[in-house]
Amino acid sequence: MLFTFFDPIEYAAKTVNKNAPTIPMTDIFRNYKDYFKRALAGYRLRTYYIKGSPRPEELANAIYGNPQLYWVLLMCNDNYDPYYGWITSQEAAYQASIQKYKNVGGDQIVYHVNENGEKFYNLISYDDNPYVWYDKGDKARKYPQYEGALAAVDTYEAAVLENEKLRQIKIIAKSDINSFMNDLIRIMEKSYGNDK
């Protein structure tokens, strides 16, 4: 709906072929986020906790009764990557982690955490004093970075933890979606032809 509101633009892929023909293309170069923010100014986003790992289209259908409103969920959360930026199943998170770290080995420590949940990257301790942590590059052990117990977080656990953060999102309330869409269309109609 959003990308079909404006007329297509003429586009020639000159970087691929300097003699490329001009073809009509969806106008993806507009600042749709600006229209969205202007329409959103009159609404309060709600916090929503995703159960399971539905795709944006499935969740839009569950919340609004319309899978085509998936882009509302993405834009409310400044998410422009519905594959890596959206919650996945735990298995998919593992597989993405394997792919991400395939060139460095899958069983790597990504970071350590203390009892307060603070993250510490690139640290190592030694057997003679396991509660003193140094940067991996500090081979002479001159500059301790942390003293105390730290728990290692490997690539798989880090992937699951990052994935779980995506469970909490912002949404426009179901009761507001129709008036929001009307406001958004009105804003786009006013700017039609004025912001090219």
Swiss-Prot record:
User: Which cysteine pairs are covalently linked by disulfides here?
Assistant: none
Q: Which UniProt keywords apply?
A: Late protein, Viral baseplate protein, Viral release from host cell, Viral tail assembly, Viral tail protein, Virion
Query: Any idea where this protein resides?
Result: Virion
Whether ATP-binding counts among this entry's keywords is no
Can the keyword Kinase be found in this entry's annotation? no
**Subunit annotation:** Part of the baseplate macromolecular complex which consists of gp5, gp5.4, gp27 (central spike complex); gp6, gp25, gp53 (inner baseplate); gp7, gp8 (intermediate baseplate); gp9, gp10, gp11, gp12 (peripheral); gp48 and gp54 (proximal region of the tail tube). Interacts with gp25 and with the (gp6)2-gp7 heterotrimeric molecule.
**What is the protein name for this chain?**
Baseplate wedge protein gp53
Organism of derivation: Enterobacteria phage T4
